[in-house]
Regions:
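Surface-exposed helical/coil interface segments that assemble multiprotein signaling complexes
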Residues: 1-117, 122, 138, 158-165
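Alpha-helical and His/Cys-centered functional microenvironments
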Residues: 23, 127-130
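Leucine-rich repeat
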Residues: 108, 130-131, 153-154
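A detector of tandem-repeat and repeat-rich interaction/domain scaffolds
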Residues: 131, 137-146
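Acidic, glycine-rich calcium-binding repeat modules characteristic of RTX/beta-roll
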Residues: 143-157, 166
Length: 166
């Protein structure tokens, strides 16, 4: 069952959530079909094949062991830290990413070598501590969505004009 979790002052629904039992059923079905996998505090390792990964509140020790290069979507939730060394691993090992969502993570910079994500279509830096975008963002030729809401980015590099699909 879908439940309303937040309503604005005019009575419009702003956020919904799934009932816990339904959420667990959906997560198990996604895992069984190898469609998506959620790596959480309860599950500190993952072996197998999946194209979509959700990382929910795991420690850095888990993140640094994580090397599934076939992943196309990577979503982060409830992380206390996102070390620069993990970012280097991410940029080196996950070349097939199409979706990267850092919303609400403690991310404070985007490395210059971000241009290695040729297939990246969606990048969310919403509510992060990122202050500037690297000039290499102009090399993300397939980028269609760049979410900078509630981020600290105040200047956008001129190279962003090269992104025809944005």
């Amino acid at each position: 069952m879908v439940q309303v979790s937040k309503v604005n002052c005019s009575g419009k629904v702003r956020k919904c959530r799934l009932h816990d039992l339904l959420r667990e059923i959906i997560l198990q079905k996604m895992k069984d079909l190898s469609f998506c996998h959620t790596l959480s505090k309860r599950e500190s390792s993952f072996e197998g094949f999946t194209r979509h990964m959700s990382i929910d509140g795991v420690s850095y020790d888990v993140l640094k062991r994580f090397e599934n290069t076939h992943i196309h979507s990577l979503l982060f939730f409830n992380l206390d830290e996102l070390p620069k060394s993990f970012m280097s691993t991410l940029f080196a090992n996950f070349k097939l990413l199409k979706v990267m969502d850092f919303e609400d993570t403690p991310l404070d910079h985007i490395p210059e070598d971000m241009c290695s994500f040729f297939y990246l279509r969606y990048l969310s830096l919403r509510n992060t501590k990122v202050k500037m975008l690297p000039k290499s963002i102009g090399k993300l030729q397939n980028l269609e969505t760049l979410d900078l809401k509630q981020s600290l980015v105040s200047n956008i590099p001129i190279e962003i004009n090269k992104l025809c699909k944005l």
